[in-house]
């Protein structure tokens, strides 16, 4: 239950111009959920967006896209989730209708649904993400770990796509959080 009507959120107004502002807590549609943010991570995309902008996002826009939290409101048509569930929420969901989705390349989807604005106290999760890319956490997983599930899944996907096996010799050019997650995931 939410006992107030407003929240704080981060908004990127321009390169290197991020501001905290107050806004109404979003109202959800029947197929959406509202999640109280527990942990929101900062990834390379966030840093690049902050430093030089991002072609798909024109300022001002809500900031952040990877997080975990607790469901505080569930839309009337949502199945499989309830108020109080601890969840990890990925940042996109494919349309499942375009050429790329039909050919197993969902990451290239022409109509991805994005979840932006996770640098906020409460996050409204769009229906396609609720249906495809939101997961109830096991009791043994904390929110810090859960907030890294999306980038970790990118690392695992990369390993699978490259068909890397234990004992293979590979060369990696570059370094960053995804590379670190690839290293700890060892096939």
Describe the predicted segments one by one.
Residues 8, 32-34, 169:
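Residues that mark the start of a beta-strand
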Residues 13, 24-25, 58-64, 111-117, ...:
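Short Gly/Pro-enriched turn/cap motifs at secondary-structure boundaries
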Residues 26-40, 53-99, 136-140:
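Glycine-rich beta-strand-centered segment in the early N-terminal region that forms part
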Residues 45-47:
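Cytochrome P450 core scaffold surrounding the K-helix E-X-X-R motif
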Residues 95-173:
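NAD(P)H dinucleotide-binding glycine-rich loop of Rossmann-like/cofactor-binding domains
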Residues 180-187:
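Residue-level detector of conserved catalytic or cofactor/ligand-binding positions
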């Amino acid at each position: 239950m939410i006992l107030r009507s407003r929240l704080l959120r981060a908004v990127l107004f321009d390169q290197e111009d991020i501001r905290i502002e107050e806004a109404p807590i979003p109202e959800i549609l029947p197929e959406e959920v509202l999640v109280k943010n527990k942990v929101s991570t900062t990834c390379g995309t966030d840093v690049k967006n902050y430093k030089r902008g991002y072609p798909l996002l024109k300022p001002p826009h809500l900031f952040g896209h990877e997080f975990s939290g607790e469901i505080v409101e569930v839309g009337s048509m949502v199945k499989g989730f309830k108020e109080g569930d601890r969840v990890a929420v990925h940042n996109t969901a494919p349309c499942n209708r375009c050429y790329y989705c039909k050919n197993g390349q969902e990451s290239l989807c022409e109509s991805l649904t994005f979840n932006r604005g996770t640098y906020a106290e409460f996050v409204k999760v769009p229906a396609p993400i609720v249906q495809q890319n939101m997961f109830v956490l096991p009791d043994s997983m904390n929110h810090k770990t859960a907030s890294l599930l999306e980038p970790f899944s990118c690392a695992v996907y990369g390993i699978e796509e490259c068909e890397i096996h234990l004992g293979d010799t590979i060369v990696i050019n570059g370094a960053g959080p995804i590379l670190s997650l690839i290293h700890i995931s060892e096939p």
